[in-house]
């Protein structure tokens, strides 16, 4: 059975925010960044445990994983059964303590 990728509303909102931010500089660049984030997430269909266990989110009831895309963004996700839930796209330039309080 193929793994499904499910984007949470929060992750989709963040994706929109990233696009809007970069669009002010260049719509072409914004599109490229969002497309890379989206296509990177698709690799999780084949390799759902490809990301590292996210140490800043240790202690939550689910095992959050992450991997870096586009130098400054982490896809934060967890695997449950045949589904990968992308819960956030985290800008790694932010204060890491904020990540612990997002869920």
What residues fall within each predicted segment?
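Arg/Lys-rich, positively charged N-terminal/basic patches that mediate binding to nucleic acids
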Residues: 1-36
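Enriched for short, Lys/Arg-rich terminal
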Residues: 69, 73-103
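Short proline/glycine- and basic residue-enriched helix-capping loop/turn segments at helix->loop/beta transitions
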Residues: 45
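Hydrophobic alpha-helical segments of small multi-pass membrane proteins
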Residues: 36-39, 65
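Basic/aromatic recognition patch in beta-strand/loop cores that engages polyanionic ligands
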Residues: 49-81
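Solvent-exposed interaction patches of small proteins and small membrane subunits
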Residues: 25, 29-32, 36, 52-56, ...
């Amino acid at each position: 059975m193929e793994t499904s990728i499910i984007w949470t509303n929060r992750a989709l909102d963040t994706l929109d925010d990233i696009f809007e931010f970069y669009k002010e500089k260049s719509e072409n660049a914004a599109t490229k960044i969002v497309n890379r984030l989206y296509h990177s997430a698709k690799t999780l269909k084949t390799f759902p445990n490809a990301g590292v266990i996210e140490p800043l989110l240790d202690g939550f009831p689910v095992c959050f994983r992450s991997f870096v895309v586009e130098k400054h963004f982490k896809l934060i996700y967890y695997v449950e059964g045949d589904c990968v839930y992308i819960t956030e796209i985290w800008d790694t330039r932010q204060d890491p303590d904020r990540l612990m309080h997002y869920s």
